[in-house]
């Protein structure tokens, strides 16, 4: 796993083999951030990374200048890894919550420019995530919600759906209120 761009461009992050995660591939992550480059200015934004896993997406946003990154991960080993890696990178702007995403979303914590979610592909209630995000106060009015998912799911009929991109087995659906 490597950081694609920004202050820590090219930095390799070695993850322990015992983490129960499927990190977003470098190819898919680079493609995602190429799209985001045309949608947002990374400087001084707030980002919420749900189902953060290894923190791969959180580190990329930090490297590109995000002011605040909140990582939510239920697995203790993963949350500890994100905290340790953030300390090593001196990423004081990354805050880690060891919590279920569904529990976290019930308690207003902040207001974000981008919310990224990479749930397990077999998550039973993945279809409910866009509605949970848009019914909460977490996303700014002009903010973006990006959901990584398998090809089994289509969100094109959701009222805030904006676009879909596919990179190998990785699918990203983009949502925005405006």
Language-model-detected regions and their locations in the chain:
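Class I S-adenosyl-L-methionine-dependent methyltransferase catalytic core
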Residues: 1-178
């Amino acid at each position: 796993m490597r950081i694609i761009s920004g202050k820590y461009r090219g930095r390799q992050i070695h993850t322990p083999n015992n983490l129960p995660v499927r990190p977003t591939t470098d190819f898919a992550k680079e493609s995602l951030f190429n799209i985001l480059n045309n949608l947002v200015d990374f400087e001084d934004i707030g980002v919420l990374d749900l189902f953060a896993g290894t923190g791969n997406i959180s580190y990329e946003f930090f490297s590109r200048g995000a002011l605040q990154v909140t990582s939510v991960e239920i697995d203790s080993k993963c949350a500890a890894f994100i905290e340790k890696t953030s300390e090593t990178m001196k990423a004081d702007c990354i805050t880690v919550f060891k919590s279920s995403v569904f529990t976290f979303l019930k308690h207003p914590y902040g207001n974000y420019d981008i919310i990224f979610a990479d749930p397990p592909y077999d998550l039973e209630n993945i279809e409910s995530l866009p509605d949970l995000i848009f019914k909460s106060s977490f996303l700014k009015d002009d903010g973006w919600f990006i959901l990584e998912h398998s090809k089994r799911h289509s969100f094109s009929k959701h009222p805030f759906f904006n676009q879909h991109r596919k990179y190998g087995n990785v699918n990203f659906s983009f949502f925005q209120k405006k």
